[in-house]
Amino acid sequence: MSKLFFVVFLCLIISVFAISPADIGCTDISQADFDEKNNNCIKCGEDGFGEEMVNRCRDKCFTDNFYQSCVDLLNKVYEEKDTPPVQE
């Protein structure tokens, strides 16, 4: 299992260095902004959601709701709510 995790992690790391804004159709974004947003997507993928999460996060040049959900997840916006008390 650890070998599989290592391979997936390695693929994610390689994808960081192998992608530029033009590769996904982002022509109106600076390299610095792209790198920051792309790193957010990769962090979501590292949290166990995988390459599909990274790809969906990058959709529409990071303007899709999926990107915002990823950022919210990283910022722990989604917290578990307390369960209501059991009434007897």
UniProtKB/Swiss-Prot annotation:
* Superkingdom in the source lineage: Eukaryota
Which tissues show it?
Answer: Expressed by the venom gland.
Q: What's in the GO CC field?
A: extracellular region
Task: Please tell me what else the database record remarks about this protein.
Answer: Co-purifies with alpha-latrotoxin-Lt1a.
Look up keyword Signal and say if it applies: yes
The entry's keywords: Secreted, Signal
Name of the featured protein: Alpha-latrotoxin-associated low molecular weight protein
Which residue positions does the secretion signal occupy? Answer: 1-18
Q: Which family does it belong to?
A: Belongs to the arthropod CHH/MIH/GIH/VIH hormone family.
Localization of this protein: Secreted
Please explain the role this protein plays, according to its UniProt record: May increase the toxicity of alpha-latrotoxin and/or other venom components. Is non-toxic to mice and to the cockroach Periplaneta americana.
The species this protein was found in: Latrodectus tredecimguttatus (Mediterranean black widow spider)
Keyword Ion transport annotated: no
